[in-house]
Amino acid sequence: MSIAENKKAFFNYHIEERFEAGIVLAGWEIKSIRSGQIQLTDGYVVIKDGELFLIGLRINALRSASTHVNPEPDRTKKLLMHKAEIRRLIGKVEQKGHTLVPLNLHYKGGRVKVDVALAKGKAEHDKRHTIKDRDWQREQGRLMRHKVSAPHKD
């Protein structure tokens, strides 16, 4: 079950490869995620000292959050992956134009996981082409719907 989607990532990037990673969260963050207080659209992944960190994931604290902890909505979260996967990602990210973007957050076995994609940025003309294709698909659906619902003349 998906918690949050990053629809902007599919528009701004060509997704080349997907990976699943665990995420280190505090208790109040889990409670906020379960209530839907999460925003993923501006998130991105950086590599520091051989570890992955998710930046820009916004988790708004609930009013009933702990009183002894000062909730920080834009806190940097550490991602958990196997060292071999991280090394492979480091090699690919160092290539020109590649980056890591979060695609979605979901539950797996009661834990929150994040899908991270190895992606390459789209040029402006690619984005326009994506919009044109999406509009054409929508128009095709409309045409087919009207064609099917039109009465036949014998």
Curated annotation (Swiss-Prot):
Regions of compositional bias (Basic residues) in chain numbering: 143-154
The principal localisation class reads: cytoplasm
- Region spans: Disordered: 123-154
Q: Which CDD domains match?
A: SmpB
Q: Which family does it belong to?
A: Belongs to the SmpB family.
* Any single Pfam family the record assigns to this protein: SmpB
The record's GO CC annotations read:
cytosol
InterPro entries the UniProt entry points to: SmpB, SsrA-bd_prot, SsrA-bd_prot_CS
Any one GO MF term held by the record is: RNA binding
| Classification lineage | Bacteria, Pseudomonadati, Pseudomonadota, Betaproteobacteria, Burkholderiales
- Please identify the protein, giving its name as recorded: SsrA-binding protein
One of the protein's GO biological processes: trans-translation
The scientific name of the source species is Leptothrix cholodnii (strain ATCC 51168 / LMG 8142 / SP-6)
Which Gene3D superfamilies does the UniProt record give?
2.40.280.10
> In the UniProt record, does the keyword RNA-binding occur?
yes
Q: Where in the cell is it found?
A: Cytoplasm
Any coiled-coil regions, as ranges: none
Task: Give the Basic and acidic residues compositional bias ranges.
Answer: 123-142
